A protein has these predicted regions:
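Amphipathic alpha-helical elements of HEAT/ARM-like alpha-solenoid repeat scaffolds that form extended
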Residues: 44-47, 62, 204-210, 291, ...
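Alpha-solenoid helical repeat scaffolds
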Residues: 176-184, 192-196, 255-327, 334-418, ...
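Extended amphipathic alpha-helical scaffold segments
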Residues: 31-35, 45-53, 191-195, 205-213, ...
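Acidic, serine/threonine-rich, charge-biased low-complexity segments
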Residues: 1-269, 278-279, 283
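Amphipathic alpha-helical scaffolding segments
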Residues: 65-70, 226-231, 348-356, 367-374, ...
C-alpha cells in the first residue's frame, strides 16, 4: 500500500489480498494454535496488537484477516476492551494510542463489532455525564472570571499583627489535603472522533444528537464532523466556494497520516489520510433541508469553521426565498457568529444574506440574537466579555484619539454587535459628552453593525421602564435628550444608516398620543438639516422672515461654528446632504404628511390629555408642540420647493 498523488493505491487487488489473508489464517495462525496449544484469546490479542502497530499502512489486509477469524463479535470487543482498560489503569503512564482508536473505528465501520459493544468498555457507567459536568464547571468558572474585577480576584490580605506561628500551631501537623480524583478518561469521545474520521457517521449520529456538548468540549470531534460536511456540500450551489487549493510543489512526497484535519504540507511532504474510502456512502446533498439536517447536531459549534459560515451566508444570499433559511439563521448562524469572532469579513457576508429582508424581520433576528446570549454558557461568556471590552473602550475614548479608539470600538463590536451597542447607548444616556467621539469612531463599522446600531437605538428609545420627563413634568429627561442628539448626529454623518425605523416609531408614538418623543424628531431635523426650533427671534431673523424663501431658510438655520469660510461652507454642504436624505426618506416611506398631521393633532390634543396635569406642564408641552410643528413645517416647505420646482428642460417643454 503506497501513496500516489491524491489517493492511496494498494499494490494488490482485493481478491489477492483476501486469498493471502485466508492462506495466512489457515497455515500460520490456526495451525500454530493447534500444534502448540496456544491460548486462542491471547492469539487474538496479538493479532489486534499487530493490527494496531500497522493500522496506517496495512489496515486492508488486517481487516480481511479479522473478517475470517473464528471468534465472535463479543469476544473481539472484549479483547479490545481489555486493551483500552490497560491505558486507563493508574500505573500506566502512556496514553491511549491513536492507532487503537483507528483500529476500533475500522472494525465498527466494517460491522465486525458494534459501537454499543465498544461503548460499554470505553465509557462505562456515567463517564459521559462526568465529562459533561467537568465541561460545564469549566465554562461556569471562566464566565465568573470574566465578570469579576481585579479586587475580587485578589488574594486575601495578611494581618501583620497576627502571630503566624500561633496560627500554624493550631493546624494539625499530620493533616494532608486529599488529592482530587483524576478526571475520567475520554476514550469514548476519541473513539467517536476516529469513527467520524473514517466516515462512520451513521454509527454515532444518535449519540451525538443526545450529547451535542461534545462538539464544544472537543474541537477535534467538530473538525472531523465538518470534514464530512464539506464533502457532502460538493454541489453546484456550493462548488465555487468548496474548491480547495492543493499544493503546487511537484517534488512533494505523499505521507499517510491518521489525523484529521491533515497536518499542513511542508516543502518535501504532503499528508494524506490513510483510510482512502472514508467518504464511501456519503452522497452530495441536493436539497437545502438536507444541509440543515446535517448541520443540526453541531448547533452553535459550527462557529469552529468560519469559512463554512461564510459559505452558508453566500448561498443564503443567492437563495430566491429565505423562508427556509430563517430558522437556521436564528438558531445556528447568528449565535455562531458571536463565538466565531470572524471579524468584519464574516459580518459583510451575513449582511449580504439579510439585507434584502424588511427591517421588522431583520430586527426580530437581532432581538433573538441578543436574548439568546443568556441561554448557553458559551454565549454568556461571550456576552460578558463583550460588555467588559465595551466599557473599557468607552473609558478611554475621546475626541483626541478617534482613530485608535474607532478601530478598537469596531473590533470589539464585531463579535457581538447587539450586546456591544446596548452598553454604548447605556453609557451615552448617562454621559452626553460621549456622543461626539462615539459618532466619529463609528466610521469603521460594517453595514450590518450600522443596522444593528439603529435597532439598538430604537430599542433604547422604546424602553417602557424609563420616564420621558423629569419629576417636574415639564422638562424632557436627560437620557431621552442624549439619545435624540446621538441619533441626529449619527444619521447626519453616515449615509449608510437608514432612519426609516426611527421615523416610523415616532409616527406610532404620536398616534398613541405620546408627545414626549417629539424631541427625537426635533433633533433629527436640527442635526441633519440645521433647522432649529424657533424661540426668541432676533431683529435680523424677524427681518429675514419677511423676505423670500431663501431669506426665510437662512433665518431658520442654526448657527454654524467655523474658524474659516471654507469650514462653514463645508458644514453647510453636509447639512444640505443630510437634509436631502431625511426628506427623501420621508417621501419614499410616505411618512412626511402623516407626521405633519400627527404633530398638528398633538398640538391641539396635548392640553386635554390629562385633567390632573399642572397648567405649567401643559403650557410647556403646548409650546414644544408648536415649536416643533413650525420647525417641521419649514423643513418640508424648504425642501418641497426643490422637488416641485420645474427644471429648465420642463419649462421648455411647457
Amino acid at each position: 500500500m503506497y501513496a500516489d498523488g491524491d489517493t492511496v493505491v494498494e499494490s494488490e487487488t482485493p481478491r489477492d489480498r483476501d486469498a493471502r489473508a485466508e492462506s495466512w489464517l489457515q497455515t500460520s495462525m490456526l495451525e500454530c494454535i493447534g500444534r502448540f496449544g496456544l491460548d486462542a484469546v491471547r492469539v487474538l490479542d496479538i493479532i489486534l496488537a499487530s493490527f494496531c502497530a500497522h493500522a496506517v499502512h496495512h489496515y486492508p489486509f488486517f481487516l480481511s484477516v479479522i473478517r475470517r477469524v473464528p471468534w465472535s463479535s463479543a469476544r473481539i470487543a472484549e479483547v479490545l476492551g481489555f486493551q483500552y482498560a490497560h491505558y486507563t489503569h493508574p500505573d500506566t503512564r502512556e496514553s491511549t494510542p491513536e492507532e487503537l482508536y483507528l483500529l476500533t473505528a475500522l472494525l465498527i465501520r466494517e460491522k465486525v463489532v458494534s459501537f454499543a459493544q465498544m461503548l460499554a468498555y470505553v465509557s462505562p457507567d456515567d463517564t459521559i455525564q462526568k465529562l459533561k459536568q467537568a465541561h460545564d464547571e469549566a465554562l461556569t468558572s471562566k464566565t465568573a472570571t470574566v465578570g469579576a474585577n481585579a479586587l475580587t480576584m485578589a488574594a486575601p490580605l495578611i494581618d501583620d499583627d497576627h502571630d503566624s506561628s500561633a496560627a500554624s500551631s493550631t493546624t494539625p501537623a499530620n493533616t494532608v489535603d486529599a488529592a482530587p480524583p483524576p478526571p475520567p478518561s475520554p476514550q469514548g469521545i476519541f473513539l467517536i472522533r476516529a469513527l467520524l474520521r473514517c466516515g462512520a457517521l451513521d454509527e454515532v449520529r444518535g449519540f451525538l444528537a443526545a450529547h451535542p456538548w461534545i462538539f464544544g468540549a472537543y474541537p477535534s470531534v467538530t473538525h472531523a464532523y465538518l470534514r464530512l460536511v464539506w464533502y457532502r456540500l460538493d454541489t453546484p450551489a456550493f462548488r465555487d466556494a468548496v474548491t480547495r487549493f492543493a499544493g503546487t510543489g511537484n517534488d512533494q512526497t505523499s505521507v499517510l497520516t491518521m489525523y484529521v484535519p491533515e497536518p499542513h504540507a511542508t516543502r518535501t511532504h504532503r499528508y494524506i489520510f490513510c483510510v482512502r474510502d472514508w467518504a464511501h456512502g456519503h452522497a452530495p446533498l441536493n436539497q437545502v433541508e438536507e444541509v440543515f439536517e446535517l448541520l443540526s447536531p453541531l448547533g452553535v459549534y459550527v462557529c469552529q469553521d468560519r469559512r463554512l459560515l461564510q459559505l452558508l451566508c453566500r448561498v443564503c444570499a443567492q437563495a430566491p426565498s429565505k423562508e427556509a433559511w430563517m430558522p437556521f439563521l436564528r438558531t445556528q448562524v447568528l449565535p455562531a457568529v458571536t463565538l466565531a469572532n470572524g471579524g468584519a469579513p464574516l459580518l459583510y457576508e451575513l449582511w449580504e444574506c439579510i439585507q434584502t429582508l424588511p427591517y421588522p424581520q431583520r430586527y426580530s433576528l437581532y432581538g433573538e440574537w441578543k436574548h439568546r446570549s443568556t441561554k448557553r454558557p458559551e454565549l454568556r461568556y461571550a456576552k460578558m466579555r463583550t460588555e467588559r471590552e465595551a466599557r473599557g473602550i468607552l473609558r478611554r475614548i475621546s475626541s483626541d484619539n478617534v482613530r485608535a479608539s474607532g478601530r478598537g470600538l469596531a473590533k470589539a463590536a464585531h463579535a457581538h454587535p447587539t450586546v456591544f451597542f446596548e452598553v454604548v447607548l447605556h453609557q451615552i444616556q448617562s454621559y452626553d459628552n460621549l456622543i461626539e467621539p462615539v459618532v466619529d469612531s463609528a466610521k469603521y463599522l460594517t453595514p450590518l453593525e450600522y443596522d444593528v446600531l439603529t435597532y439598538a437605538l430604537l430599542e433604547a428609545l422604546s424602553d417602557p421602564g424609563k420616564a420621558r420627563t423629569k419629576q417636574d413634568g415639564t422638562n424632557t429627561s436627560l437620557w431621552l435628550k442624549s439619545l435624540a442628539s446621538f441619533a441626529g448626529a449619527l444619521f447626519r454623518k453616515y449615509a449608510a444608516m437608514d432612519c426609516t425605523p426611527i421615523l416610523q416609531y415616532l409616527a406610532n408614538r404620536l398616534h398613541e398620543g405620546q408627545v414626549a418623543d417629539l424631541v427625537v424628531l426635533s433633533e433629527l431635523i436640527l442635526k441633519m438639516a440645521g433647522i432649529e426650533p424657533m424661540g426668541e427671534l432676533s431683529d435680523a431673523q424677524m427681518a429675514a422672515l419677511s423676505g423670500g424663501p431663501l431669506l426665510q431658510t437662512e433665518a431658520h438655520l442654526t448657527l454654524i461654528p467655523g474658524t474659516t469660510p471654507a469650514a462653514v461652507l463645508l458644514a453647510r454642504n453636509s447639512l444640505k446632504k443630510g437634509a436631502m436624505r431625511l426628506y427623501r426618506t420621508l417621501m419614499q416611506n410616505r411618512l412626511a404628511v402623516p407626521l405633519l398631521i400627527l404633530v398638528a393633532q398633538q398640538r391641539e390634543a396635548c392640553v386635554f390629555s390629562d385633567d390632573d396635569v399642572h397648567i405649567k406642564s401643559l403650557s410647556s408641552t403646548f409650546d414644544t408642540c408648536v415649536s416643533i410643528l413650525l420647525q417641521y413645517t419649514h423643513f418640508l416647505m424648504s425642501h418641497c420647493l426643490l422637488y416641485t420646482s420645474p427644471s429648465p428642460r420642463d419649462r421648455q417643454k411647457s
